[in-house]
Structure formats: C-alpha cells, structure tokens
C-alpha cells in the first residue's frame, strides 16, 4: 500500500485513469488519498445504495447520491436490487471531526463514513465530483481510501440581494453551488440604501416603500438614470423555504440586516427613525450616504428590536449579521438627540475614535444584548472595532487583514474576508466591455491567500474561525453575470477554507478545477474561463 497526497502527478502515476474511471482529483483537495491494492469497484445499474441509519438526514444523503450519479452518468440505480455491489453510507462516532469523513473503496463496496450526517454529505460530494461527466453503462472506481476533514469550521459566501434582487430559483441554484464546494454558510445580505428585501409584518412600509427605487444609475456614477422602477423582496415563507433548502444541504443561512448605516430603504419608509426626519428616498445610485439611523431616538431601538424579533423567528442560525460598516456619523454630530445620548452615557473620544464612534459601539452592543436574550450572537463588519465591543461579537475583517488581527487581540472571533482576496465583484481579467466596481482580482490571487500563516500568534490561530467570499451586486445583474463573477474564485476560496495550507498547490488546483468546470458547464453556469486557457 502506497500513501499519497492527492496531487496530479502522483495520482496519475498511482491510479490508471480511463474515460469511465472515477477520478479522485477533486476540489477542494482532500487531506489524503491512499491508493489501495485490490480490484476496483464497478458502478452500474445493479449497484445499490445502503443507508445504515434511520436518520432522515442520512436518508436524504442517499437520495442526493443517487441523484448525482444519474445526473453525471445517466446510470439510474435499482433500489430494489440486492444482488449487485453496494455503496454504504454510515455514521462512525470514532471519526474526530464533526464534518470529517472516510471513503473506503473496495471491489464489492464503497463505504462513506462520517461522524455526523454532515460529514457523510461531504463524502458524497467527493464521490460525486470523482464521477466522469458522460453517459456510461458503468464507472470504475480504483481501490482507495480517502480521509478528509475541513481546515476551518466557517466556510462562507455572501450574496448581496439588496442592491439587485435575485429570484428564488437563483437563490436555490446558488446554494447548490455552495454545497458542491463544501461551503457551509450562506451569508444573505438583505437590506441596503438601495432596497429593503425582507418582509416584516410589524412594519409593512419596509416592503411597500423601502423595497422600491424609482430608477437606477446607468454605468459607474455617470449621473444618468434608466427611468425604470426597480424592486422586489422575499416573503417570510420564501425565506423559510431558503433556510430549509440550505439546511438539507448542511448550509446555515446567516441573514444580514445592516445598521446603523446603509438604511435608506428603511428611512424612506419610516423617516422618523433618522436624525433629520427626512424626507428620504430609496437610493438610486451606489455609494455611502450620510443619513443613517438615529442612535439618540428610543424609537430606533424599538424598531431594530422588533425587526430582529421577526428575523430570528425565520432564521435559526446562531449568528445574525448586523453590519456596522460604512456608517458616516456626520448627522450624529449635529443631532440634538444623539448628542444628548452621548452626554447621558458619558461617552468621550478615545484611542483615536470619536464620541460618535463610541455611540455606535453602544448602539451595536444594545443590539447584541437583545439578540443574546434570544439565544443569538452578532457578526459585524470590522468597523465595529472602533469602540468597545460586546464579547460575544464575531468580526468580519474586510478592510484587509488587520481587523481580524485586532479582533483576536481583543479575544474576539474573526472571519477573514479581505477585499484584496475575496471581493468577487472585482474584475478577474482586463475587460473593457464589462462595468464592475473596479480593481483586479484574478483567481490566482484568491487561491494564494492564507488566513492563518504558520508563524501566526496563538491568539490569531485560536480566533480565526474561517473565510468568506463576497459578491456585492452594484453591477451584477442576473444569473449569468453572477456565476461569471463567482466561479472559479469561489472554488479557490473553498480550497483555502477546506484544505491544509501545506497541501495546496495552484498547478494542481488548475488541473482539478478544469475537471470541475465541466460540471459547471453541465449546469449552464457561464463562468470565467481565464483559468482554463492554455498560457502561451
């Protein structure tokens, strides 16, 4: 028996591959693959799937595997047949990692074991991605043993549905894409200056008024507008449907209600929540706006708490994202109520941050306490570090990596999502035909990021919980452009999230991702092809 790490050269040397052979060169890269002696497993119509558990989640894993096999090969397994070879899904409490799995491939059986149904699901995904994408009567799986587990417990992707609204069929397809890449968190950005996308029963004007903008700027801040009303929002039933669809694929949906800034959608509906009283309108162009929630108005806190009460009733996630980014405090500086609140609380500028920054920290901490009373914790963008932060807060480090480092120093957990590596609204290649937010982010750069260097301080290693890619949608309209911006960079991020850093290799990734690109094409995902081109 020869132990190998899954790399292109070693796998090709160890396991002979033919058109209808399974290929264990998958994305993300498993921690280890061992080529075993013995005859291969031959998948054919007489193969059966045995779920060694009465657990509903395990049964669903079996159904997914059957669907994936038919999807890739055209082979429809006979559930009633008991005479052929078997793929067995089973739980194994001896596996250490909650999301880890072991696949053992022998002549008569393929066994996928996990400590939890979630781990088994990731094993199913690996088997799925090893399948050849062609119609076949049989597929040969070389004898092998795969032992795998994730590097990070948080592996996320954010979709901004506030600047541009995406319909339910796309949301589900997006979730399917996450599942394919072993991503376990869907961060759903739902409110913005340009539109409020969440049904809240207590405040119907949020969707009656706040979800609609009269028009949208054309191009990159041209001053020209399309004169076309734009809107859309998700009902509670639709959001619950998304939560269920994601949960079936072991993905947690974390909603974001951004505050106190990026709130013109809400202020247009309820102007009394702003410092000036309005009138306000839903933003028709992109950027940051000075009007934010009034932190000196008790009705603001009542509004926020009531909204979040309805949010936690829809979303069972441990975390609720409450934003905290890009909140200009100029209105607070001149607002009598905000200044009175600063005086009442005895807030003063310190450590380079103003009294108004301390007021924002107070605001965020009040929201955190309310959510903690509901059994939840908050996530916020790294601006929330501009003041004293509630100890249960998790920080998303987006303005580079320093936010994550500072959070760790304060004993706070952090998720690394720096713009220079993980902002997928950036260009992937020079292209004058496309209008995007700007900057260049090729897949090589995304792949090369290491959120926790080997020589990192122990505090950093302890508190960095994972990574996340973000798709902001100022210039992303529709399914095709969304997938073009997402892939293959989501795959690059996913490998960083899953695979130990010392096992990553970009040349290997390119080969493996080129195979996965065939599956993207099968789904009709029009992805950026720059990675797959032969370099001259």
Regions found by a protein language model. Name each.
Residues 96-302, 306-319, 366, 370, ...:
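Feature activates predominantly on carbohydrate-active enzymes
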Residues 377-393, 398-536:
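Flexible, acidic glycine-rich loops studded with aromatic residues
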């Amino acid at each position: 028996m020869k132990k190998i790490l899954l790399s292109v050269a070693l796998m090709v040397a160890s396991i002979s591959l033919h058109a209808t052979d399974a290929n264990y060169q998958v994305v993300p890269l498993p921690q280890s693959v061992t080529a075993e002696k013995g005859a291969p497993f031959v998948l054919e119509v007489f193969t059966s799937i045995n779920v060694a558990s009465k657990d509903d989640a395990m049964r669903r894993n079996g159904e997914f595997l059957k669907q994936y096999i038919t999807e890739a090969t055209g082979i429809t397994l006979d559930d009633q047949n008991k005479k052929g070879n078997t793929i067995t899904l089973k739980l194994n409490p001896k596996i250490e990692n909650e999301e880890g799995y072991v696949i053992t491939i022998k002549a008569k059986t393929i066994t996928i074991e996990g400590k939890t149904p979630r781990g088994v699901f990731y094993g199913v995904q690996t088997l799925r991605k090893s399948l050849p994408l062609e119609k076949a009567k049989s597929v040969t799986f070389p004898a092998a043993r795969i032992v795998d587990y994730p590097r990070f417990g948080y592996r996320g992707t954010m979709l901004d549905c506030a600047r541009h609204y995406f319909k339910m069929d796309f949301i589900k397809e997006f979730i399917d894409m996450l599942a394919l890449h072993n991503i376990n968190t869907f961060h759903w950005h739902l409110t913005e200056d340009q539109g409020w996308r969440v049904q809240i029963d207590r405040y119907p004007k949020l969707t009656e008024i706040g979800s609609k903008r009269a028009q949208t700027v054309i191009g990159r801040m041209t001053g020209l507008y399309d004169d076309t009303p734009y809107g859309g929002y998700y009902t509670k039933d639709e959001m619950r449907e998304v939560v269920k669809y994601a949960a079936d694929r072991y993905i947690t949906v974390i909603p974001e209600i951004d505050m106190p800034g990026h709130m013109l959608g809400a202020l247009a509906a309820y102007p009394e929540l702003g410092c000036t009283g309005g009138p306000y309108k839903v933003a028709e162009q992109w950027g940051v706006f000075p009007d934010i929630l009034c932190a000196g108005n008790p009705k603001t806190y009542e509004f926020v708490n009531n909204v979040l009460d309805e949010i936690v009733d829809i979303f069972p996630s441990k975390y609720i994202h409450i934003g905290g980014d890009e909140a200009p405090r100029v209105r607070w500086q001149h607002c009598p109520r905000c200044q009175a609140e600063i005086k009442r609380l005895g807030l003063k500028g310190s450590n380079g941050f103003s009294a108004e920054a301390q007021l924002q920290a107070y605001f965020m901490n009040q929201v955190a306490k309310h959510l903690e009373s509901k059994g939840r914790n908050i996530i916020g963008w790294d601006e929330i570090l501009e003041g004293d932060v509630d100890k249960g807060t998790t920080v998303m480090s987006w303005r580079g990596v320093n936010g994550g480092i500072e959070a760790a120093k304060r004993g706070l957990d952090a998720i690394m999502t720096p713009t220079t590596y993980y902002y997928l609204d950036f260009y992937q290649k020079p292209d004058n035909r496309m209008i995007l937010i700007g900057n260049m982010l090729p897949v090589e750069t995304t792949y090369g990021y290491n959120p926790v260097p080997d020589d990192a301080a122990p505090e950093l290693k302890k508190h960095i919980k994972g990574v996340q890619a973000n798709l902001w949608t100022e210039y992303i309209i529709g399914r095709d452009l969304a997938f073009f911006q997402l892939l293959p960079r989501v795959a690059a991020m996913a490998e960083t999230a899953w695979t130990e850093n010392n096992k990553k290799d970009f040349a290997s990734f390119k080969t493996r991702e080129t195979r996965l690109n065939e599956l993207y094409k099968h789904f009709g995902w029009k992805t950026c092809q720059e990675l797959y081109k032969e370099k001259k």
